[in-house]
């Protein structure tokens, strides 16, 4: 019984406006949607197809980036393992070198101590010999001094002359 905007009512005797908004809006909306679907099918299809292609391209690009990132991560992990192995090797070498240097220093210090002991012993021996020689000279000088004193007191002039002559003869 109803039609589009201008509708004729069977009960009334003429044409008039249908003021029932609900009925007229639904009909108008159905007509507009039908026209849009009919006219915009190609356009909307192309638009959706292009959008789908763009999304698929972005997905492929993201997947490629993911694959390259995974490969880069794998390479970085490999390099990290190699670096850790190298660091461990260097640490072992450094410890071994430190132990060798330590032993070398200890050996050198022991040799220096022995050399110093030998030098000190030689110095002590030399000093001891010098002191003994000096004591001997002092003892001889003291003995000679006493002998001279005693001889001069006990010997007369003639006995002294004979002693001097005998001493000169033995030389």
UniProtKB/Swiss-Prot annotation:
<keyword id="KW-0793">Thylakoid</keyword>
<feature type="transmembrane region" description="Helical">
    <location>
        <begin position="26"/>
        <end position="48"/>
    </location>
</feature>
<dbReference type="GO" id="GO:0045259">
    <property type="term" value="C:proton-transporting ATP synthase complex"/>
</dbReference>
<dbReference type="Pfam" id="PF00430">
    <property type="entry name" value="ATP-synt_B"/>
</dbReference>
<dbReference type="InterPro" id="IPR028987">
    <property type="entry name" value="ATP_synth_B-like_membr_sf"/>
</dbReference>
<comment type="function">
    <text>F(1)F(0) ATP synthase produces ATP from ADP in the presence of a proton or sodium gradient. F-type ATPases consist of two structural domains, F(1) containing the extramembraneous catalytic core and F(0) containing the membrane proton channel, linked together by a central stalk and a peripheral stalk. During catalysis, ATP synthesis in the catalytic domain of F(1) is coupled via a rotary mechanism of the central stalk subunits to proton translocation.</text>
</comment>
<keyword id="KW-0138">CF(0)</keyword>
<keyword id="KW-0066">ATP synthesis</keyword>
<dbReference type="GO" id="GO:0031676">
    <property type="term" value="C:plasma membrane-derived thylakoid membrane"/>
</dbReference>
<comment type="subunit">
    <text>F-type ATPases have 2 components, F(1) - the catalytic core - and F(0) - the membrane proton channel. F(1) has five subunits: alpha(3), beta(3), gamma(1), delta(1), epsilon(1). F(0) has four main subunits: a(1), b(1), b'(1) and c(10-14). The alpha and beta chains form an alternating ring which encloses part of the gamma chain. F(1) is attached to F(0) by a central stalk formed by the gamma and epsilon chains, while a peripheral stalk is formed by the delta, b and b' chains.</text>
</comment>
<keyword id="KW-0813">Transport</keyword>
<keyword id="KW-0472">Membrane</keyword>
<keyword id="KW-0375">Hydrogen ion transport</keyword>
<keyword id="KW-0812">Transmembrane</keyword>
<dbReference type="GO" id="GO:0046933">
    <property type="term" value="F:proton-transporting ATP synthase activity, rotational mechanism"/>
</dbReference>
<keyword id="KW-0406">Ion transport</keyword>
<comment type="function">
    <text>Component of the F(0) channel, it forms part of the peripheral stalk, linking F(1) to F(0).</text>
</comment>
<comment type="similarity">
    <text>Belongs to the ATPase B chain family.</text>
</comment>
<dbReference type="InterPro" id="IPR002146">
    <property type="entry name" value="ATP_synth_b/b'su_bac/chlpt"/>
</dbReference>
<protein>
    <recommendedName>
        <fullName>ATP synthase subunit b</fullName>
    </recommendedName>
</protein>
<keyword id="KW-1133">Transmembrane helix</keyword>
């Amino acid at each position: 019984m109803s039609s589009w905007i201008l509708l004729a009512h069977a009960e009334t005797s003429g044409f008039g406006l249908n003021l029932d908004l609900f009925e007229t809006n639904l009909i108008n909306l159905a007509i507009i949607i039908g026209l849009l679907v009919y006219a915009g099918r190609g356009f909307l299809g192309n638009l959706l197809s292009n959008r789908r292609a763009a999304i698929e391209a972005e997905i492929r690009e993201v997947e490629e980036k993911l694959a390259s990132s995974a490969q880069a991560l794998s390479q970085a992990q490999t390099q990290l393992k190699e670096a850790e192995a190298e660091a461990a090797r260097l640490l072992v070498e450094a410890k071994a070198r430190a132990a060798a240097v330590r032993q070398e220093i200890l050996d050198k210090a022991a040799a220096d101590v022995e050399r110093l002991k030998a030098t000190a012993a030689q110095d002590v021996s030399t000093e001891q010999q010098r002191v003994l020689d000096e004591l001997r000279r002092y003892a001889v000088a003291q003995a000679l001094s006493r002998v001279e004193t005693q001889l001069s007191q006990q010997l007369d002039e003639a006995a002294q002359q004979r002693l001097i002559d005998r001493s000169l003869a033995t030389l």
